[in-house]
Curated annotation (Swiss-Prot):
One of its GO terms (biological process) is plant-type hypersensitive response. Confers resistance to the incompatible pathogenic bacteria P.syringae pv. tomato DC3000 in a PR1-dependent manner. Seems not involved in abscisic acid (ABA) biosynthesis. InterPro entries: NAD(P)-bd_dom_sf (IPR036291), SDR_fam (IPR002347). It is an enzyme of class 1 (oxidoreductase). Belongs to the short-chain dehydrogenases/reductases (SDR) family. Its EC number is 1.1.1.-. Substrate binds at S144. Induction: Accumulates upon Pseudomonas syringae infection and after treatment with systemic acquired resistance (SAR)-inducing chemicals, 1,2-benzisothiazol-3(2H)-one1,1-dioxide (BIT) and benzo-(1,2,3)thiadiazole-7-carbothioic acid S-methyl ester (BTH). Pfam families: adh_short_C2. This is Short-chain dehydrogenase reductase 3a. NAD(+) binds at residues 12-36. Highly expressed in the radicle tip, lateral root primordia and tips, and the area surrounding the cotyledon hydathode of young seedlings. Keywords: Hypersensitive response, Oxidoreductase, Plant defense.
Amino acid sequence: MSGLRLDGKIAIITGGASGIGAEAVRLFTDHGAKVVIVDFQEELGQNVAVSVGKDKASFYRCDVTNEKEVENAVKFTVEKYGKLDVLFSNAGVMEQPGSFLDLNLEQFDRTMAVNVRGAAAFIKHAARAMVEKGTRGSIVCTTSVASEIGGPGPHAYTASKHALLGLVKSACGGLGKYGIRVNGVAPYAVATAINSRDEETVRMVEEYSAATGILKGVVLKARHVAEAALFLASDDSAYVSGQNLAVDGGYSVVKPI
């Protein structure tokens, strides 16, 4: 029996040029998948594709807020590989924390456009491709501990992740009849490009995560989140749908709200 959990599978990973997405590209290809890296960061995305091998990964530049570009990214994948088995909708943005009294509605709209509308567009077009080919696919969205509770994240980010979790549950209900599973993976504070500009910021985020987290002795890394996404993408979770898999060391379960 093969130990490759995505052997022969075709996957799209949005936000795949860095952070959790880049780790997922490496992990998914290690497990036998062919991956299309979707991101607007062309140089970084191409570098990730080269690092895993152009025979295993391709890069497609896309603004997730533009539905036509999203549709074309899915079309590119199906034309290149013949099908689509997995969507890991991971692209996201986060605004700077601040007082709700000073809420910047332009930033709010941008955050919702990327984190919710972008995910909705990819789920829509990926699901269409899966249904057309008769593929019992898996869709995984990066949510957050902020999709379940308020407080840990900035206001627009928290609102967007709550909405994204609702989208996951709604899509689960709407796509189950086609054999398509839809789940979320919900990390606690993990240092990625979304919140860390340099090594000093990475250190600060990891120190915050270690100090405020429940599970001690482990520092949450992007790789841990990618491993959870791999489980949800693979047939190991064949009867799991509509769930929001927490990768938070117990934070959302026991942390006082």
